[in-house]
Amino acid sequence: MKIVGLITEYNPFHNGHQYHIQKSLEVTGADAAIVVMSGDYVQRGTPAIMPKHLRAEMALKCGACAVFELPVCYATATAELFALGAVSFLDQLGVVDYLCFGSECNDLDGLTKIADILCDEPDEYTKFLKENLRAGMSFPAARQDALSSYMGISDCSFLLSDPNNILSIEYLKALRRVKSRIQPFTIKRMESDYHDQTLRSTYSSASAIRSLLAYSSSVLQTQQVTGETFENTPFSSILNELEDQVPKSCLALLKDYHKVLYPVYQNDFSLLMKYKLLNKTPQSLIRYMDVSETLANRIQNNLNDFFNYKQFCELLKTRELTQTRINRALLPVSYTHLTLP
């Protein structure tokens, strides 16, 4: 029996994810698909829009044979650590033969070549990288230009500009790092662009679906919905727009559990975060793994302007501190007392 492993977030599950499961089984010839999925927090450093058990149920209804939770320390980490944690998990299961991931380029050879360069760090590539950094380029731009120079191509941005291509490269690096016997495959992503907020026919991005669910929640703020009248509510009409975007079994779950188990948003934790930060000093904040001294001081200096969780993260942004990095750094402050010794 052959098993294909999938690394996912399903935030939320949609047609593109079902296609991923089905196509992965097809291209690998595997008999079953095993999923490693982020839990209640995702890689952007924010809560998943719905609980992990509901998302896992959707995956099981749509072709997955088993769903395992990726520990939160990896699920909310950088692309490199996210990939390393997930690949290590699949490798340690000891039953996974293939890893199949979606990419924009659908070019396994090209992705593998870049992954090998980043793993081996040949002297010529390292020289180009250091020169670019000394010239003041940001690390992503410096790395992209160094790879282009080393590989002898005019521009490799088509392989490094998309988040899914970047994750694909990190999966390939992780397979090498753990010396895994798992064989990689990639398939062309069918859904819209990662950041696309517009619903498309059949394959929409998770971002677009989250936006619609957020809008439906705002509608319900002034609506009293009961089970008997659900089909006649504005919310029912809004959610029915997803009929072509998510599998029927998932749409039924979305209708059943809206305002019961989901949606969950970053701002739902605003009071908790404000309370935690009011009880912290810069010295105590830097004990959290991803909180630098610079970020700790910015938190302290801007705390009086805290309006809500999301707004505060946006307020803390700088050229060097992206919002995603800030999200990841603050997340452990809100849910744990554990800090570095």
What are these regions (language model features)?
Residues 1-4:
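Extreme N-terminal starter segment of soluble prokaryotic enzymes
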Residues 9, 38, 189:
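Cofactor-binding loop segments of dinucleotide-utilizing enzymes, especially the Rossmann-like FAD-
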Residues 12-19, 23-153, 157-158, 170:
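N-terminal Rossmann-like or analogous alpha/beta NTP/dinucleotide-binding catalytic cores
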Residues 123-160, 167-306:
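Glycine-rich, Lys/Arg-enriched anion-binding loops that position phosphate/diphosphate groups
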Residues 159-164, 200-201, 315-326:
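Structural motif
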Residues 166-177, 325-335:
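Short, hydrophobic/amphipathic alpha-helical patches that form generic packing surfaces
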Residues 307-315:
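Alpha/beta-hydrolase fold catalytic core
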Residues 336-341:
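Conserved small/polar residues in nucleotide/adenosyl-binding loops
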